[in-house]
Structures are given as structure tokens and as C-alpha cells.
Amino acid sequence: APMFPNVILVGLGNTLFYTVTSFVVGLLGGIVLALMRLSSFGPYRWLATAYVEFFRGVPALLVFLAFGYGVPFAFGVSWPIPVVVMVALGMVSAAYIAETLRAGLQAVPRGQMEAARSLGMPTWRAMVTIVIPQAFRIVLPPLTNEVILLTKDSSLVYVLGLAAHEYELTKFGRDGISALDAGMTPILVAGLFYLVITVPLSLLARRFEARSTKKGH
């Protein structure tokens, strides 16, 4: 069996990798969806709304199964596990991030955009340089919480059947009980490592929230 420290470090590294890559996909998709939701062009709004409602309403586990087994079976393609995780978690995350960003964009006073437009600045430039940066400051706490949720949801990758080098923390904890003959230790260690990731993120979210509240007064 693999050595205990090596396996847990692989699991930790993979969990962080799955979380970060899926968050990047979710953030990019969320920005596009949020702008579509706020668009004056009806079809964009309807398409984005349908996407958001679908992926917020379907369990992430089903999305994993769809991209891990359904799509490869239907189209005869085979994706590496990291790609499946990045796409599946990223698409689910994009739906939640889109709603968070939409709320943040709507919280920026309209006068900011109107002032920029009155100075002759194009709408897209005003959005990129003035509105979106302010919106991001508003939504930093919920975005940090989204990273925490992604960290925990990355554990769903176990349903895809992993090679040892693809293990994340939960898979390590689950298989380690029997493979390493170490009792409950693998589960406890996996839980501890999750806390090492999520507790600092939670504290960071609170700090962002406190700073945002202070600036609001």
C-alpha cells in the first residue's frame, strides 16, 4: 500500500487543484452569466436564467455523473478526471457565482455608470473599470464562501473511480481505512486537512465582510 504521508499529500494537492481550477471556470462563467442576466436583450436574459435555475436545482453529484459517465458514453469521448471535475464543478459554481455577481452589480449605484457615460466613456469601459471592480469588493465575502463550498464538493469526484494519483482527501479517508489498516485515522486526518483549508477561508470571508460593512457606514 502507498505510504500514509505520501497519499494524504497527494489528496491535499488534488483537492486544492480541483477547487482552484473549478473556481476559475465558475468565476469566468459566472461573470458572463451575470452580465447576460442584466442584459436588455431578452434572449440573453432567458438563456442565462434557464442555465442558473437548472444548475442550482440539480444536485452536483448528478452533474458529476453526467460528465463522468453520460457524456463519454453518449459521444464516445474520454476525458481525464481533472477535466471532468473542472467542467462539472465549474458549471455548477458558475450558476451560484452568477447570482452573487448579479446582486453585486445591482448594488453599485446607477449614478456611477451615468457619470461615466456623461464623461463620454463607452458603456463597456465604464462597466470594466468602474462598476465591476466595485461589485467585486461587495461580493468578496460570498465568493470566498463559494470557494469553501467547492472545496467540500470536490469530494464528489470519488464517484468517478480514481487512480491513486487522482485521490482527493475524502477518497483518501474512505479507502485508507481498509488499505492502510489504520482504523479511523485516515478519515480524521482527511477531516483535519479540510479544516486547514476551510477555516482560514471562513475567517477571510468574515474579514472581507467586516471591511465591507465598515466602508458602507
Give, region by region, the residue ranges found by the protein language model:
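Transmembrane alpha-helices and adjacent helix-loop boundaries
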Residues: 1-217
